[in-house]
Design a protein with these regions (language model features):
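Hinge/capping helix and adjacent helix->loop/strand transition within the periplasmic-binding protein
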Residues: 1-64, 113, 126-159
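Short helices/loops that flank or line small-molecule/ion binding pockets
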Residues: 44-49, 63-77, 85-90, 180
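Conserved functional loop/turn residues at catalytic and ligand-binding sites
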Residues: 13, 58, 72-73, 80, ...
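Alpha-to-beta junction loops
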Residues: 24-28, 52, 70-79, 92-95, ...
Length: 197
């Protein structure tokens, strides 16, 4: 995800936003697609790591959360890169940091949270293919091979990278290990947000 603010905002980098939020607890607001969503969790991770209090304003979806930022209802948003890329390129929004392990190819000048001083803020929006455990081994293998071919397709890679969502293909055991690592990182973050059963 990428943390964005209006281009007219006073914050030129993540440090300036954090310092302002420290001076004015609860005065700076951010929108999300709802509690525990992919737009809420990375902001909650950032505010915890920075030791700041920002007002969370949940909406019913990413579209309304982005509209609230563009309309001036809130002052910040952590979003997938796709929905905000055109607004960054048009100069309506300023990207302060990304939450991945590496910089986003479409935003090479935007630091990661780790580079900006928050190494514990690592949040990835990802998708994967899953099948029922009862799926025959032969069919599972066909699906894995088809997914690997699709991931190697140059046109698909370029389209996703242009949209701000580069593909990082992981197969079988590597993908399973990634899921376990991601869950281990996110469980404490989600528990800090609030009650989880």
């Amino acid at each position: 995800t990428v943390l964005v603010v209006p281009a007219a905002s006073p914050w030129r980098n993540l440090g300036e936003l954090a310092e302002d939020a420290k001076r004015r607890p609860g005065a700076i607001s951010y929108s999300s697609a709802g509690n525990f969503s992919a737009l809420h969790t990375p902001m909650a991770m950032f505010t915890a790591a920075a030791g700041i209090d920002m007002l969370h304003v949940p909406f019913q979806g990413g579209g309304p959360a982005l509209t609230a930022l563009l309309g001036g209802t809130v002052q910040a948003l952590a979003s997938g890169t796709g929905p905000v890329m055109q607004h960054i390129q048009a100069g309506r929004l300023r990207a302060l940091a990304t939450t991945g392990a590496t910089r986003v190819p479409g935003l090479p000048d935007v630091p990661t949270m780790a580079e900006a001083g928050y190494p514990d803020v690592l949040y990835l929006i990802w998708a994967g293919l899953f099948v029922p455990a009862s799926t025959p081994a032969g069919l599972r293998e066909q699906i894995r091979q088809a997914a690997a071919r699709a991931a190697e397709d140059g046109d698909a890679q370029r389209a996703l990278t242009t949209a701000g969502s580069p593909m990082a293909y992981l197969d079988g055991p590597a993908f399973e290990a990634f899921i376990r690592e991601d869950a281990a990182r996110l469980i404490p973050a989600v528990r800090r947000i609030g009650r989880v059963e």
